[in-house]
Curated annotation (Swiss-Prot):
Any one of the GO BP annotations: translation
Lineage summary: Bacteria, Pseudomonadati, Spirochaetota, Spirochaetia, Leptospirales
InterPro entries: Rbsml_uS13_C (IPR027437), Ribosomal_uS13 (IPR001892), Ribosomal_uS13-like_H2TH (IPR010979), Ribosomal_uS13_bac-type (IPR019980), Ribosomal_uS13_CS (IPR018269)
Similarity comment: family membership: Belongs to the universal ribosomal protein uS13 family.
Protein name: Small ribosomal subunit protein uS13
Taxonomic source organism: Leptospira interrogans serogroup Icterohaemorrhagiae serovar Lai (strain 56601)
A Pfam family per the record: Ribosomal_S13
Bias kind Basic residues: ranges: 105-125
SUPFAM superfamilies: S13-like H2TH domain
Subunit note: Part of the 30S ribosomal subunit. Forms a loose heterodimer with protein S19. Forms two bridges to the 50S subunit in the 70S ribosome.
Free-text function comment from the UniProt entry: Located at the top of the head of the 30S subunit, it contacts several helices of the 16S rRNA. In the 70S ribosome it contacts the 23S rRNA (bridge B1a) and protein L5 of the 50S subunit (bridge B1b), connecting the 2 subunits; these bridges are implicated in subunit movement. Contacts the tRNAs in the A and P-sites.
Keywords: Ribonucleoprotein, Ribosomal protein, RNA-binding, rRNA-binding, tRNA-binding
Ribonucleoprotein is among the record's keywords: yes
UniProt keyword RNA-binding present: yes
Amino acid sequence: MARIAGIDLPREKRIVVGLTYIFGIGNSLSKLILKKAGIDESIRVKDLNESQEAAIRKTLEETAKVEGDLRSEIQLNIKRLMDIGCYRGLRHRRGLPVNGQRTRTNARTRKGGKKTVANKKKVTK
């Protein structure tokens, strides 16, 4: 089993698809990495040899931030937004949608579960 950037890639999949299991790598970046490393996209992960794995690791380090480095950078960017007090930072702090989505209805993913509000009892005379 090929282990790249701390992730075990699925053995039966093609390498171009297997690389997308790493956080921060999509289809286009996967193809770019394989092109730079000089590896055919149609080869399966189980058929990779050690030199090909090493070439992928080396190219990956040169090309992009992935996994832990990328996650920590994203968290630092969000923390910076919250610290400077900009609109996006306030939305992150309050746990609301950041990119202009509506919040009167929907936005349940960001806001959490539904909070029911009890009705006031009518006063009888």
